[in-house]
UniProtKB/Swiss-Prot annotation:
Identification of the protein by name: Polycomb group RING finger protein 2
Residues joined by cross-link Glycyl lysine isopeptide (Lys-Gly) (interchain with G-Cter in SUMO2): 51, 88
One GO CC term on file: nuclear body
GO biological process entries: anterior/posterior pattern specification; apoptotic signaling pathway; cellular response to hydrogen peroxide; chromatin organization; chromatin remodeling; embryonic skeletal system development; embryonic skeletal system morphogenesis; in utero embryonic development
Keyword line: DNA-binding, Isopeptide bond, Metal-binding, Nucleus, Phosphoprotein, Repressor, Transcription, Transcription regulation, Ubl conjugation, Zinc, Zinc-finger
Compartment annotation: Nucleus
Species name: Mus musculus
Subunit structure: Exists as both a monomer and homodimer. Component of a PRC1-like complex. Interacts with CBX8, RING1 and RNF2. Interacts with CBX7. Interacts with PHC2.
């Protein structure tokens, strides 16, 4: 799950503070030529004696610099939402000022200019504030239309919706609210509880303060939220087919075949590696042809190998089972053209 990156407000201070007074923006005003922002009172007082931007020295206007500045309502709303208690303190200072100087009039002033706008009307929230919300089951668009028709006909009073009211801190997330509903209603783990604002599902990491800022709720009533219960999505796991890797034996038969492929058959062995020498005719190229003949014990039944099996050569061993020698007793074998004794 992807979450939003949380950063400290001190990292945003260079973008929220006025370079002239060193405080947060109050009535933020932006210069059109260079888009640098300042407090309205600060920049108006500065341009009375200067015609250049205090940050980049761009000429604002040759004769009337006040024509090149604009009120930045969006930036001011961002500052009020990011800095806790700033809007409330500013409105209090304005009310105190006009209370101390009752004869002072505000030309074309609004309620906000006079400090008569409450924090609830502005929609600003703090982390420690308590938010009143209503939660009810989401019935869908079709059920809501049917319910509306019943209400218009006068039959809707018989059905009462299960609306519940809660008081929660503004910093509480949607995930915590969903867990609360799951525990309250004993929802099994195979189902998920989803929170909605009207018909739009909410992200789990949204706080109640985020919902108040994103959606058109002006604190003139409880925050209207809805919930629905849906089956949890299960991830499909595809079965993995094991693929035999090269050089690995999967059975005893394959191991036997690999050994038999490496060891040659007795019929194609050279004379030096023959395991059936003849005492009458020494093998050509063998060490016994240049020296005294070696004596070999004779056995009534010479060793033989069954078809499909291999004999140990050069000190090698075989892990295959050998058949009894009686199966190959009638087979004739020759070594270098000389018949072997039976």
């Amino acid at each position: 799950m992807h979450r939003t990156t949380r950063i400290k407000i001190t990292e945003l201070n260079p973008h929220l503070m006025c370079a002239l007074c060193g405080g947060y923006f109050i009535d933020a005003t932006t210069i059109v030529e260079c888009l640098h922002s300042f407090c309205k009172t600060c920049i108006v007082r500065y341009l009375e004696t200067n015609k250049y931007c205090p940050m980049c020295d761009v000429q604002v206007h040759k004769t009337r610099p006040l024509l090149s500045i604009r009120s930045d309502k969006t930036l001011q709303d961002i500052v009020y939402k990011l800095v806790p208690g700033l809007f409330k303190d500013e409105m209090k200072r304005r009310r105190d000022f006009y209370a101390a100087y009752p004869l002072t009039e505000v030309p074309n002033g609004s309620n906000e200019d006079r400090g008569e706008v409450l924090e609830q009307e502005k929609g600003a929230l703090g982390d420690d504030e308590i938010v009143s919300l209503s939660i009810e089951f989401y019935e869908g668009v079709r059920d809501r239309e049917e319910k509306k028709n019943l209400t218009e006909n006068g039959d809707g009073d018989k059905e009462k919706t299960g609306v519940r009211f809660l008081r929660c801190p503004a910093a509480m997330t949607v995930m915590h609210l969903a867990k609360f509903l799951r525990n309250k209603m004993d929802v099994p783990s195979k189902y998920k509880v989803e929170i909605l604002y009207e018909d739009e599902p909410l992200k789990e990491y949204y706080t109640l303060m985020d919902i108040a800022y994103i959606y058109p709720w002006r604190r003139n009533g409880p925050l209207p939220l809805k919930y629905r219960v849906q089956p949890a999505c299960k991830r499909l796991t595809l079965p993995t087919v094991p693929t035999p890797s090269e050089g690995t034996n999967t059975s005893g038969a394959s191991e036997c075949e690999s050994v038999s492929d490496k060891a040659p058959s007795p019929a194609t062995l050279p004379a030096t590696s023959s395991s059936l020498p003849s005492p009458a005719t020494p093998s050509h190229g063998s060490p016994s042809s240049h020296g005294p003949p070696a004596t070999h014990p004779t056995s009534p039944t010479p060793p033989s190998t069954a078809a499909g099996t291999t004999t140990a050569t050069n000190g090698g061993t075989s892990n295959c089972l050998q058949t009894p020698s009686s199966t190959s007793r009638g087979r004739k074998m020759t070594v270098n053209g000389a018949p072997c004794p039976p």
